[in-house]
Amino acid sequence: SGMYLTVGTGIGGGIISDGRLIHGMEHPETGHILIPRRTGDDIPCTCRFHQSCVEGLASGPMLERRTGMKGKDIPADSPVWDLEAFYIAEALVNYTMCYSVERIVLGGGVMDNKFLFPMIRNYYTELLSGYIDMPQVKDTDTYIVPAGLEGNQGIIGAMNLF
């Protein structure tokens, strides 16, 4: 089982369980799970439906709202990346709790900033607080991984549907 999450203009994803894509009444709205805001973060969320969903707090448009810059132009040492990593990690903890996946793959334009991965993994471990005591979850270097396929995963995935 696994999950792919794209973090870019929006946040979305899919979950595979027993070799099948999870699909119910609608597609999973992985970007619209509600997460607690970090204390002191009072910049209005970019989601018009929620005030604290992961998409509204951590997508590319929110990075631009916070800094006035596109994600690719924000320096790696900007404090906004710490907040970004925290919010993504909050979401990943929730996905782990709900779907119990064996691996989480992160892609999308925001995740092209590879320096985010260690930050996300550290917050993930901190937020999970040892609740799930499984070796594969504890080894965050292999549990939370960057997407491969050089940014073509969406196109290749779509082609595999035909």
Spans of features found by a protein language model:
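ATP-binding/phosphotransfer module of carbohydrate and carboxylate kinases, centering on a glycine-rich
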Residues: 21, 37-162
